[in-house]
Amino acid sequence: MDAHRKHVRGIVDELMNNSIKAGATQVDVRVEMKEGEIIIWVKDNGRGMDAEKLAKIKKALDQPRRDELEEYYGALAGESMVGTGLSLVGMMTDRAEISSEPNKGTEIRLFRKTED
């Protein structure tokens, strides 16, 4: 589990940063680390997103895990994959759930398997 703590810290930092940029005055964060899986939940009261922007964010979070890319593309994956912070978050997680409503905020739940 210790090997995953660095990834969790980076993911939480990126999500909190985005919440603050979206004007949130309240950000709730919960991390549940259990055998086999880590669940990261962030909910804010920021500007929220319309359906079009929400779809773009979902696409960014739906990146394949980086270790899966490296297996497929070899060492080139790390150099050729350039994207937003959320794309990087997507590459560190297995599954994302996101909901948002304009002027009401955003809720993101991310799941990362810890068993190899």
For each feature predicted by the language model, list its residue ranges.
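Conserved beta-strand-loop-beta-strand hairpin that lines the nucleotide-binding pocket
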Residues: 21, 25-116
